[in-house]
Amino acid sequence: EEINGNNYIDPTQLPYDHKWEFPRNRLSFGKTLGAGAFGKVVEATAYGLIKSDAAMTVAVKMLKPSAHLTEREALMSELKVLSYLGNHMNIVNLLGACTVGGPTLVITEYCCYGDLLNFLRRKRDSFICSKQEDHAEVALYKNLLQSKESSCNDSTNEYMDMKPGVSYVVPTKADKRRSARIGSYIERDVTPAIMEDGELALDLEDLLSFSYQVAKGMAFLASKNCIHRDLAARNILLTHGRITKICDFGLARDIKNDSNYVVKGNARLPVKWMAPESIFNCVYTFESDVWSYGIFLWELFSLGSSPYPGMPVDSKFYKMIKEGFRMLSPEHAPAEMYDIMKTCWDADPLKRPTFKQIVQLIEKQKNKNE
């Protein structure tokens, strides 16, 4: 992972492989999932994307008429990066694109539970503080839910439509271990239940799983010499089986009205997630992504609180960061997870762990928690 800065990929230099082309007349558009000043992401049905006669729910990123050349280039760059990266369970994978005969459309996996930040906030009231003595109760709770299962859905390659009143049980530990070995979550393991997923509780095991999955996704990006630059809970999507997927909705994010993006020079930047070297020297590296991952962990274990609560981004904030101010442990973080956060926030970028090392550290914590 320690790669010379000159080797980071330059999206503008990547080729676009036309094998991804998909006929735009086979897309049927639905509701808007996210929108910004220049772009939006829309839910759509793609006909014949995987199998010749099958319909599949997808997410389609596109530009608005207000977009400029810069935004058009940015969308094309994102398409090239996704094409270059290839598939990984913990990134939002490319499924196709429309680049001829009309505006550019980027077709990706649809993640039915939306972004992780809002998911965490919705689950706050039902969070189960799974201290050791609570584990039996949590296991019983999950087993009771799973005993209410009805018939299995046999679709292994396509998304299942999420209709009101039908939902899917969180996988058991055995399911999760099995899916990790396989390398992707097999949907026949996810069974419809009487209780909707929205009513299923969140526990420490889930938070550790999200931490682990995002670290795996980031290790994959690093192995491909790719820097994310905007890692945060709002940029992680969640799908069936509580699988997390890293995305970048840059064009579809309303950064003008999102207080997380602070005007700095000519740009709006997510300052509270940025490493000091990124804030003060505009340097972005794997190590600065690791800093952002530490902030993401803080969001995760605070169940979606905003970092540096009550602190506006002003000259005092910049001074405190320069002087080494760091956040205290969030409410639900085990001591070992807070230790990881603190190492991610080392002032010396080279003393921060790599994502590969973070994966190993969280693996130990997950095993201990089981």
Curated annotation (Swiss-Prot):
Q: Which UniProt keywords apply?
A: ATP-binding, Kinase, Nucleotide-binding, Oncogene, Phosphoprotein, Transferase, Tyrosine-protein kinase
Domain of life, per the record? Viruses
Q: Which GO terms describe its cellular component?
A: plasma membrane; receptor complex
Q: Which Pfam families does the UniProt entry name for this protein?
A: PK_Tyr_Ser-Thr (PF07714)
**GO molecular function, a single term:** transmembrane receptor protein tyrosine kinase activity
Q: Which reaction does it catalyse?
A: L-tyrosyl-[protein] + ATP = O-phospho-L-tyrosyl-[protein] + ADP + H(+)
The record's listing under InterPro entries reads: Kinase-like_dom_sf, Prot_kinase_dom, Protein_kinase_ATP_BS, RTK, Ser-Thr/Tyr_kinase_cat_dom, Tyr_kinase_AS, Tyr_kinase_cat_dom, Tyr_kinase_rcpt_3_CS
In terms of Gene3D superfamilies, this protein maps to: Phosphorylase Kinase, domain 1, Transferase(Phosphotransferase) domain 1
* Active-site residue numbers: 230 (proton acceptor)
The entry marks the following residues as binding ATP, namely: 33-41, 61
Question: Residue positions of the PTM Phosphotyrosine?
Answer: 261
Q: Where is the Protein kinase domain?
A: 27-370
Q: EC number(s) for this protein?
A: 2.7.10.1
Query: Which EC class does it fall in?
Result: transferase
Q: Which PROSITE patterns match?
A: PROTEIN_KINASE_ATP, PROTEIN_KINASE_DOM, PROTEIN_KINASE_TYR, RECEPTOR_TYR_KIN_III
Q: Which terms under GO biological process does the entry name?
A: Kit signaling pathway; positive regulation of cell migration; positive regulation of receptor signaling pathway via JAK-STAT
UniProt remark on domains: Lacks the transmembrane and extracellular domains.
Tell me the protein family, please: Belongs to the protein kinase superfamily. Tyr protein kinase family. CSF-1/PDGF receptor subfamily.
Give the note: This protein is synthesized as a Gag-Kit-Pol polyprotein.
PANTHER family, alphabetically? Answer: MAST_STEM CELL GROWTH FACTOR RECEPTOR KIT, TYROSINE-PROTEIN KINASE RECEPTOR
The protein's name is: Tyrosine-protein kinase transforming protein kit
The organism is Feline sarcoma virus (strain Hardy-Zuckerman 4)
Q: What is the lineage of its organism?
A: Viruses, Riboviria, Pararnavirae, Artverviricota, Revtraviricetes
